Amino acid sequence: MKRILVALDSSPCAPLVLSAADKLAELTGARLVVFRAVTVPPDMPRDVLLVSDLRLEDILTRNARGDLERLTRDVPPARLEKLVASFATPWDGICTAARNEAVDLIVIGSHGYGVLDRVLGTTAGKVVNHADRNVLVVRAAL
């Protein structure tokens, strides 16, 4: 195993998922590609969506990348290959990033933050069903 895609969201479980992936990378000598998909939050006020000088997509992606930088602060540089933030539907963005980055494994948390996850099925479940490579699902402490 050479490369692991770690799919993180903004939930409180993200550090646990990152820690599990980092331990696996340490044991296998793999490097981490840390990923976050961002979308427009459903509760975002409509007037924010009408920002003219700044593209909302760019703002959200830049903020997500900053979050990834903070989350990965304690990961040894030798194991951290890159950070990727993408404006995409989470499950599709994760599967696409895994292909584009040619990773050997996807590591994802079992429960995300989204309300839609409870209605339409979890992001983790969709990744497991659609990914063309192995997926390790990290279960949050109950």
Regions found by a protein language model. Give the residues of each.
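Short, acidic/small-residue loops that bind anionic groups at enzyme active sites
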Residues: 130-140
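Small/aliphatic-rich secondary-structure junction motif
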Residues: 2-51
